[in-house]
């Protein structure tokens, strides 16, 4: 078994989560400490591996059973934290800085640090990108738009999971135009999901 995390083992972007107790955003300190204890227990007692999400890799998530029979299957890691794969090797480009993320009174949101990946099998291609956002308005700086620079790296897909539970601050027009999915999956958990604006963009 393997556990993959966006910021293992340092957990220091945008702040040191091991010592962060200010409640300025992200995961609750008590919950994070419990996660660390869980991971240590699993490593020690059950041999579980813990790895950092390897941006650009198409080897980290691989078939376990008879992979040679499915040469067209691939999972490609596209984005994690503030780093986006360039499409070449393991090269990445930063989408925003720690300072930009913490600009509002030192508070931050984990959403923009979400991982993103693409699953391919033959002609089928599927995108999933967690809570990555794509909105720019009077309340959100340009860096908040993760989707527009990520779109050409992902390219056209067969199907996709709508970013941020299909919330109105994600799945922007640029992203939809480039990915051009035939099927979308909305992982809704609130009465305002999907956002009406997202619904209009999907029409």
Residue ranges and their predicted role:
Residues 2-136:
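Flexible, acidic/histidine-containing loops and adjacent segments that form or flank the divalent-metal
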Residues 2-22, 103, 108-112, 133-203:
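Cap/insert and terminal regions of metallo-dependent hydrolase folds
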């Amino acid at each position: 078994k393997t556990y993959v995390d966006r910021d293992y083992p340092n957990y220091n972007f945008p702040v040191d989560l091991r010592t962060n107790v200010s409640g300025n955003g992200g995961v609750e300190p008590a919950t994070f400490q419990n996660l660390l204890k869980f991971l240590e227990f699993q490593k020690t007692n059950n041999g579980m591996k813990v790895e950092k999400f390897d941006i650009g890799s198409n080897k980290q998530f691989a078939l376990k059973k008879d992979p040679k029979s499915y040469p067209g299957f691939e999972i490609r890691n596209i984005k994690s934290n503030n780093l986006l794969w360039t499409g070449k090797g393991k090269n990445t480009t930063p989408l925003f800085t720690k300072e930009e993320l913490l600009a509002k009174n030192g508070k931050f949101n984990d959403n923009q640090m979400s991982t993103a990946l693409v699953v391919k099998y033959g002609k089928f291609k599927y995108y999933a990108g967690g809570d990555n956002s794509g909105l720019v308005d009077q309340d959100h700086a340009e860096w908040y738009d993760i989707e527009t620079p990520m779109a050409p790296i992902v390219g056209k897909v067969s199907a996709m999971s709508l970013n941020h539970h299909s919330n109105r601050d994600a799945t922007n027009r640029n992203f939809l135009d480039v990915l051009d999915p035939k099927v979308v999956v909305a992982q809704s958990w609130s009465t305002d999901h999907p956002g009406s604006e997202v619904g209009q963009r999907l029409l």
